[in-house]
């Protein structure tokens, strides 16, 4: 295989990181809704923690995207 095809295979594999981020964010918010339904008085604290967790999880997907773009255009 030449380097160009290996770059595109690596870029395709980076999609796994973006898929993982999407699953992580959906899991965080489904757990948030479930937790708020059980204990509405803890809504403010739960929302803060969920947004921090979602931001960190989404950062993984963005890093994966940046690495994929670096692989394609380098």
Swiss-Prot record:
Protein name: ATP synthase subunit c
UniProt subcellular location: Cell membrane
Annotated NCBIfam families: PRK07558.1 (NF005733)
Quaternary organization: F-type ATPases have 2 components, F(1) - the catalytic core - and F(0) - the membrane proton channel. F(1) has five subunits: alpha(3), beta(3), gamma(1), delta(1), epsilon(1). F(0) has three main subunits: a(1), b(2) and c(10-14). The alpha and beta chains form an alternating ring which encloses part of the gamma chain. F(1) is attached to F(0) by a central stalk formed by the gamma and epsilon chains, while a peripheral stalk is formed by the delta and b chains.
Function: F(1)F(0) ATP synthase produces ATP from ADP in the presence of a proton or sodium gradient. F-type ATPases consist of two structural domains, F(1) containing the extramembraneous catalytic core and F(0) containing the membrane proton channel, linked together by a central stalk and a peripheral stalk. During catalysis, ATP synthesis in the catalytic domain of F(1) is coupled via a rotary mechanism of the central stalk subunits to proton translocation.
Source organism (scientific name): Rickettsia africae (strain ESF-5)
Annotated membrane topology: Multi-pass membrane protein
GO MF annotations in UniProt: lipid binding; proton-transporting ATP synthase activity, rotational mechanism
Positions of disulphide bridges: none
GO cellular component terms, A-Z: plasma membrane; proton-transporting ATP synthase complex; proton-transporting two-sector ATPase complex, proton-transporting domain
Chief location category: membrane
PROSITE patterns noted in UniProt: ATPASE_C
Membrane-spanning segments: 8-28, 52-72
UniProt-annotated site: Reversibly protonated during proton transport, residues: 58
Keywords: ATP synthesis, Cell membrane, CF(0), Hydrogen ion transport, Ion transport, Lipid-binding, Membrane, Transmembrane, Transmembrane helix, Transport
Similarity remark: Belongs to the ATPase C chain family.
């Amino acid at each position: 295989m030449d380097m160009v095809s290996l770059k595109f295979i690596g870029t395709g594999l980076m999609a796994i990181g973006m898929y993982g981020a999407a699953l992580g964010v959906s899991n965080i918010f489904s757990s948030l809704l479930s937790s708020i339904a059980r204990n509405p008085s803890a809504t403010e604290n739960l929302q803060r923690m969920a947004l921090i967790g979602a931001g960190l999880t989404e950062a993984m997907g963005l890093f994966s995207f940046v690495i994929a773009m670096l692989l394609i255009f380098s």
